[in-house]
């Protein structure tokens, strides 16, 4: 499983969602996802999808957001 994933690549919601779900399936409690330039795509939609894996937003800044798997 991955403990930390930094997303800094495609800026299309569909592409980011595909990557996030792929890594979420390979994560565990405590895994953190950091998304760069999250205002360029629909982060609300992605974060909502990740809640089914137990991810919650723990910090957000100007262009980065961090989610952590709580369960």
Identify what each model region corresponds to:
Residues 1-5:
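A short acidic, Gly/Pro-enriched loop at the edge of an enzyme's catalytic core
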Residues 8-11:
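Switch II (G3) loop of P-loop NTPases
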Residues 13-71:
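C-terminal substrate-binding/active-site "lid" region of AdoMet-derived donor-dependent transferases
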């Amino acid at each position: 499983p991955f403990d930390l994933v930094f997303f800094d690549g495609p800026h299309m919601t569909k592409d980011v969602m595909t990557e996030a779900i792929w890594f979420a399936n390979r994560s565990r409690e405590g895994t953190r996802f950091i998304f760069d330039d999250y205002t360029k795509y629909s982060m609300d939609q992605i974060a909502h999808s990740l809640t089914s894996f137990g991810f919650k937003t723990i910090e957000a800044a100007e262009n980065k957001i961090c989610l952590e798997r709580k369960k």
